[in-house]
């Protein structure tokens, strides 16, 4: 193709137009920047330097100069909430909502921010109402999640379950706590003097259905263990001991780490039908495969009761040699002291020689009992903190096992093991 020389005329013209456009844009940007108050830049500087208190003061000055700036009000409200000044955060967002000229998108944002203010302030009723007003907006997912937390904190399990169903309609992902919501329904149905066994059974069926989505996961094992334990409780209330025993025994296979939570109840099932020796062997075999302090305690005490001192201590020595544990030794000494105190070595004797011999034996027993007591008290001081369960999310420690952490409200964050075993 031939090059046309007249194109050369347009090249300088194009460069000139580009230079003029750039100058106009630059001047406009400078003009807009100069129109911003100095307090605005001070606020940004304080934020960058992590000085929220001074940033708030600077932004308040800007807001006074330009009360129509919604973005600045959102920033102020967020800062107030982060600092825990909930009344001021609520006032900022309510003032935004009171503006008739506020665009719809900003109105939805202000409503969502206000709901978060109420939630953090602990005003759950008002938070619930505020979140419900944004369920049909782009904030639907976080709003439903917040409503779930509210219903959960109020132990309103039916409404929590309905909220989870709504969440599942918005996002396609499993919600593990749904299993526990159904389990809590079952617990409520079985509580009191007149338990509703039908309602409990229906709730556990629903829990089974929810747990199906979690099968093969670690959380799925925990959920199935809890369902089996509650079905055992339901069977006991329904006078079906064989079912109770079967459900408890199933925990040994579906979630072996949780076996210590049902060991005592399972042993009692065997004891009721005169098969305590068989029950002991079941638990002992499980301990050898999945050792834990709580299972050690159950097996040792039952072995001591059924077979006596020597077999129990032989088991204890072997167990503690394989898995050294101060807490295990503390439990062992506690059981021995209890057994010692149940015995009374001093009895009346007509024969003087027998009386002297018995007195000597009693004195030796008392000395050994005092030694046991001293040894146990020394060890117990060092094991008190280790004899706890701990949340792996927030670290909250408790003497009892919880499915939901009392500290951070997370589900299934308590390991069914004592602190000493986790360190």
Predicted ranges, named:
Residues 28-30, 60-67, 97-103, 132-138, ...:
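Solenoid-like repeat scaffolds
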Residues 52-53, 86, 124, 157, ...:
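TPR-repeat structural position
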């Amino acid at each position: 193709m031939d090059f046309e020389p007249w194109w050369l005329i347009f090249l300088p013209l194009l460069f000139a137009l580009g230079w003029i456009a750039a100058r106009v844009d630059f001047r406009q940007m400078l003009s807009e920047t100069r129109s911003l108050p100095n307090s605005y830049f001070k606020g940004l500087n304080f934020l960058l330097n992590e000085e929220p208190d001074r940033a708030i003061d600077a932004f308040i000055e800007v807001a006074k100069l330009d009360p129509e700036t919604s973005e600045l009000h959102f920033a102020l409200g967020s800062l107030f909430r982060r600092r825990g000044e909930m009344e001021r955060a609520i006032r900022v967002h309510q003032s935004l909502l009171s503006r008739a000229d506020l665009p719809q998108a900003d109105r939805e944002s202000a409503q969502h921010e206000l709901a978060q203010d109420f939630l953090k302030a602990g005003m759950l009723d008002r938070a619930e109402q505020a979140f419900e007003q944004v369920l049909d907006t782009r904030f639907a997912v976080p709003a439903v999640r917040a409503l779930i937390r509210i219903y959960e904190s109020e132990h309103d399990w039916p409404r929590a379950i309905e909220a989870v169903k709504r969440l599942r309609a918005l996002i396609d992902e499993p919600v593990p706590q749904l299993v526990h919501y159904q389990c809590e329904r079952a617990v409520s149905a079985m509580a009191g003097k007149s338990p509703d066994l039908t309602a409990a059974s229906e709730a556990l069926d629903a829990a089974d259905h929810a747990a199906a989505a979690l099968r093969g996961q670690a959380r799925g094992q925990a959920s199935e263990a809890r369902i089996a334990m509650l079905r055992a409780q339901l069977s006991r209330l329904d006078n079906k001991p064989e079912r109770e025993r079967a459900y408890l025994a199933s925990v040994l296979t579906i979630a072996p780490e949780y076996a210590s939570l049902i060991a005592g109840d399972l042993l009692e099932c065997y004891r009721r039908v005169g098969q305590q020796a068989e029950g002991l062997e079941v638990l002992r075999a499980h301990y050898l495969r999945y050792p834990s302090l709580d299972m050690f305690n159950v097996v040792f005490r039952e072995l001591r009761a059924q077979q006596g001192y020597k077999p129990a201590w032989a088991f204890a020595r072997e167990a503690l040699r394989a898995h050294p544990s101060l807490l295990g030794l503390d439990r062992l000494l506690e059981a021995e002291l209890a057994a010692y105190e149940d015995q009374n070595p001093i009895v009346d004797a007509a024969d003087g020689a027998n009386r002297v011999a018995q007195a000597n034996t009693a004195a030796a027993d008392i000395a050994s009992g005092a030694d046991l007591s001293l040894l146990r008290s020394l060890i117990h001081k060092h094991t008190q903190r280790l004899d706890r369960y701990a949340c792996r999310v927030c670290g909250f420690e408790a003497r009892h096992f919880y499915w939901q952490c009392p500290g951070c409200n997370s589900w299934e964050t308590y390991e069914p093991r004592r602190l000493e075993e986790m360190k």
